[in-house]
Regions:
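Membrane-embedded alpha-helical segments of multi-pass membrane proteins
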Residues: 2-9, 34-35, 45-62, 100-109, ...
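Membrane-interface helix caps and helix-loop-helix hairpins in membrane proteins
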Residues: 40-42, 88-97, 144-152, 196-197, ...
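N-terminal hydrophobic segments of proteins, predominantly signal-anchor/transmembrane helices
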Residues: 16-100, 104-107, 135-140, 180, ...
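Alpha-helical transmembrane segments of multi-pass inner-membrane proteins
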Residues: 8-16, 80-87, 104-112, 118-219, ...
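Transmembrane alpha-helices of multi-pass inner-membrane enzymes
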Residues: 54-58, 339-350, 357-400, 406
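Short, aromatic-rich membrane-interface segments at the entry and exit
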Residues: 2-6, 21-28, 42-50, 95-100, ...
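A membrane-periplasm/extracellular boundary helix in multi-pass inner-membrane enzymes
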Residues: 193-199, 215-258, 266-276, 405
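Long extracytoplasmic/lumenal interhelical loops at the membrane interface
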Residues: 148, 245, 253-306, 324-329
Length: 406
């Protein structure tokens, strides 16, 4: 019966993806927070978003108006080359699984969201879908104050909420005054409260760095202060309702605490493996053998200095792409929002990965799918410029903050 249901779902999804690619993309993006393993205990774990991503591949091959990965392609291939060289010398039982996982995010997700949309409208449902899921998870988290929400650990939920917060803030920035903007303001308040209650400091750091990236690109600090008038009181109220023990746990950095101690132990384990081969590391798959809560040290341990350099190049290539493209579009352009969200998500995920698991399902799918959206926007800007369309905006108009919070 289970196989019949799975087959029926796959067939229906294929039909939807071929007919409405925007809906298929939304089903990938907005279900990413649900990291629950659907493998049934198999050797390879996968979530509903990963299933949807793979089911959309036929639509990518048959219906995509273009097939691009963007400027990150060469750094990604370089990174995979270093990973292959390291793994050839230090093969592990989980090496293939890790390669598949990395390819799924860095190649398939990026290519899917960069290639399949016909226009920016095909991505709107994805963004609003994630905001809706974020509001749902935040409400449950705030009401129950449980360490698990719908079978998801609070750290995973916190990572997803930080992504939803970034998307909601950028959509609020870009929105026209009216009911839609008021709803986004309410969503921001709810998601912000849920993020706080999650007590995930990695998610807090990721959200902070993501928001800082948005501000650096938009340079609309006055408008952000108006948004803070809504967010800060709600966050303070949520904080006062937290139990004293939870507040102490969230603000404590004593090395004697088990969670802080575990982070230091993780770094020491990674350091030992890195010292065995500083150039190429000890092989991909090591992340499955210890509690890898620092992406920099994990990358050094698995692929050495060459791997860390290649991973840094991937992020630099994406940020350079966004910086180049955003100078050619106005801040009210939908393409600007896609560029800003892509950069903010990747920076957020990297910051989070410095203090927690980077390659965990959920937020990483959202981050690199957003990178694909930014790549789509980049190619759209190039197309407009090549066709002589006016994509610029008067500088004073672009920097003029909104007159009202709502």
């Amino acid at each position: 019966m289970l196989y019949i249901a799975a087959t029926f779902y796959a067939v229906v999804f294929w039909l939807v993806a071929l007919k409405r690619p925007g809906l298929a993309l939304a089903l990938i993006f907005s279900t990413a927070p649900f990291q629950n393993d659907l493998s049934g205990g198999g050797p390879v774990k996968f979530s509903i978003a990963e299933i949807n991503l793979l089911l959309t591949v036929p639509a990518l091959l048959l219906r995509a108006p273009r097939f691009v990965i963007g400027p990150v392609a060469w750094p990604v291939l370089l990174y995979f080359g270093v990973c292959a060289a390291s793994s050839a010398m230090h093969w592990r039982a989980t090496t293939i699984v890790c390669f598949v996982q990395m390819a799924l995010y860095l190649l398939v997700a990026v290519a899917m969201f960069a290639s399949l949309p016909h226009d920016a409208d095909d991505l709107k449902l994805s963004l609003y879908g994630l905001i809706g899921v974020g509001v749902l998870l935040a409400l449950i988290m705030t009401i129950t104050r449980s360490s698990y929400v719908l079978g998801l650990h609070k750290n995973g939920v916190g990572a997803s909420l930080s992504c939803a917060l970034i998307v909601a803030l950028e959509m609020w920035f870009a929105g026209e005054p009216g009911t839609g903007k008021r709803l986004l303001a309410a969503a921001l308040a709810i998601i912000g409260a849920g993020l706080l209650v999650s007590l995930s400091r990695g998610a807090w750091l990721g959200a902070l760095c993501g928001v800082a990236t948005l501000l650096a690109l938009r340079r609309q600090f006055g408008l952000f202060l108006r948004a803070a008038l809504v967010l800060v009181p709600v966050i303070l109220i949520a904080w006062t309702f937290l139990p004293k023990e939870s507040r102490e746990t969230a603000t404590g950095f004593d090395r004697g605490r088990w969670n802080i101690k575990a982070r230091y132990e993780s770094v020491e384990v990674a350091r030992e493996f890195f010292q065995k081969d500083p150039l190429l590391g000890s092989g991909v798959g090591l992340r499955k053998e210890y509690d890898a809560t620092n992406i920099a040290w994990l990358t050094l341990a698995e692929t050495g200095a060459l791997g860390l350099g290649a991973l840094a190049l991937i992020h630099l290539a994406l940020l350079r792409m966004v910086w180049r493209a955003q100078k050619s579009v106005g801040r009210e352009d939908e393409l600007f929002s896609l560029l800003a969200i892509g950069a903010a998500m990747v920076v957020s995920r990297l910051a989070h990965g410095l203090v927690d698991h980077y390659w965990s399902r959920g937020a990483i799918m959202i981050a690199w799918s957003s990178a694909g959206m930014a790549t789509f926007a980049f190619w759209e800007v190039k197309r407009r410029l090549a066709e002589g369309e006016d994509v610029s905006q008067d500088e004073e108009e672009a920097q003029e903050p909104a007159q009202s919070l709502l």
